[in-house]
Amino acid sequence: QKTWVPLALLANRGGWAAADNICGKPVEVQGIAGSAVFKTFELEVARTGLSVSEAEAAGFEPASVTIDARSRAHAHPGAESIRVHMVGDKKSGRLLGTQMVGKEGVAHRIKAPAVALHAQMGVEDFGQTDLPYAPPFSPVWDPLLTAANQLMKKL
């Protein structure tokens, strides 16, 4: 479905595709997830894919879950709260979108669901991904995996 998402990577990718096509190399720009991050004061905010309302408008039957987790192993110094909101489709089980906010670890974590969206992964498959663990960077169950496993219960 057509959309307008004014992000630098998408503009660059579109420019390269236009140049390639002009030079006779047929290139098609693949779909986008609208992945974006920003920081406001101490909070990192990130999104990729569809929100619940966007999913409904696109004809999906969305289910969603919101979880609160820690950015690092709970006993590790400096662990901060992260809130994850994940959206999936009840009919297909497909992951549709993820939104996150927290003081650390959000901007880099959003990359995993962005790749999952590009690959059109299901929520169950995403919940089985092997995300890295080390106490200074993540709890054993990464907040994204916790969200996916909770969302599976609603699909």
Feature annotation, model-predicted:
Residues Q1-L50, F137-L155:
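A conserved FAD-binding loop/helix module that cradles the flavin
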Residues E44, T48, A57-L155:
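Flexible, glycine-rich terminal cap/loop adjacent to redox cofactors
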